[in-house]
Amino acid sequence: LKMKKKIEKLRNHGTMTESGFWGMIRSALRQKSRWWKPITECKQKSKRAYTGNNKRQKFEYKCNVCKNWFPDKEIAVDHIKPVGTLKSAQDLPKFVENLFCEIDNLQTICASCHLIKTKKDKITHE
């Protein structure tokens, strides 16, 4: 049995694979979503003044899952209902709609809880 080799479509004058192209689009959209007001508002709602010994840290944020407090760099704003995949033009409308959602689909979550949730979401939605 001979397997036919799948020929992948190339973009950008043959320098980018199809998956690389959609990865670039996904990354650009996620970057822009950081300034989406519901995302910044969600983070603000979980913030309090830091009272520990680190003089450089001014605030800390509460994880909605484990309920512990974390510095800014250890917290993420998570989509409760996963955003989904972006692998083709057909995925684009749903991906954008889910990514740029309102605050009722957002929560602050620490890095370790986020990792666990993301792995569960990938298993569930594959």
Predicted regions and their residues:
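Short flanking/linker segments adjacent to small metal-binding domains or redox-active Cys/His motifs
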Residues: 116-124
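Cys/His-coordinated zinc-binding microdomains
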Residues: 67, 114
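The −1 position to Zn-ligating cysteines in a subset of zinc-ribbon hairpins
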Residues: 62, 76, 109
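Long, contiguous alpha-helical scaffold regions
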Residues: 63, 125-126
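Histidine-centered nuclease catalytic patch
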Residues: 68-106, 123
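Short, charged surface segments at domain edges that flank catalytic/cofactor-binding sites
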Residues: 4-65, 93-104
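Cysteine-rich micro-motifs
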Residues: 105-113
